[in-house]
């Protein structure tokens, strides 16, 4: 009798195990079906990563690199060469913001759109010269003041959504990736980075005309009490405002534009600028407002004074190695004579409308 009970118990156990095994197999099938439904969605997402488009700056995407350049009618050849040199040496997402006047916009657009530069991204910004009323002194017999010279003072209002920009004069050629200049470190509390005039690159050579254009005394009249009261030593190294990187967030916070306007207005009534000032009349207020409050640009990213004479102030090897060349001064590379015109001219694109043409000595 006991053996029968044991046999029954064993049979029951076997049946239980068979049922359990069947249920486990069923559950396994269900799980497999569920995995087969959801699996491809998961793994497809992973497998697609290597084929996803690269959106890094080297492919023209990513963070916008805002480059601001003035567009003046009689100097548009310079603007075109600057844009061409930048766009040809970078794959970054560069957008050109061209500050100009209403009567020049059509000419700029037709030139850009009618050449290989139709590929570049650009926006035309209108500068209203009326903001300068009462802020610019006009001396008798002096050359008329060009309003566009002061457009750089108003970058936050011209580009209200921008946080960081590069400003370049139109007599500049860039020979390397502009993103390197854009990535110039700007210290906390500084609204801009400039290139000092006393750096080892530029201070070796004299500047044509005027006083010492490497120090504040070359820009400000130290006979005036208001200038002396600033406590700025006359031999303090100056900087060149033709190339700079601006932190517009900090610029707005410090209200730099209003500070610049204040010194412009004071110059109108008190004549605070140096009488021997040669060149950029926008420099004095910038030098005052940014005194000891700016970061430094790598000197190779602003090799300047190429327009101060027609001679070769730098060796061809050095000019070739420079990241950025600046023909500031009287002798522009699109003019009759200048230094290293062949370097500039390789980036120049002829005007499809024929309104702008190069002036060359051999053309006489």
From Swiss-Prot:
Membrane topology: Single-pass type II membrane protein
Annotated organism of origin: Xenopus laevis (African clawed frog)
GO cellular component, one term: membrane
GO molecular function: UDP-glycosyltransferase activity
Gene3D superfamilies xref list: Spore Coat Polysaccharide Biosynthesis Protein SpsA, Chain A (3.90.550.10)
Domain of life, source organism: Eukaryota
Gene that this polypeptide is encoded by: glt8d1
UniProt-annotated location(s): Membrane
Record keyword Heme present: no
Enzyme Commission identifier(s): 2.4.1.-
Name assigned to this protein: Glycosyltransferase 8 domain-containing protein 1
Cited InterPro entries: Glyco_trans_8 (IPR002495), Glycosyltrans_8_dom-fam (IPR050748), Nucleotide-diphossugar_trans (IPR029044)
Cytoplasmic side: 1-5
UniProt topological domain (Lumenal) ranges: 27-364
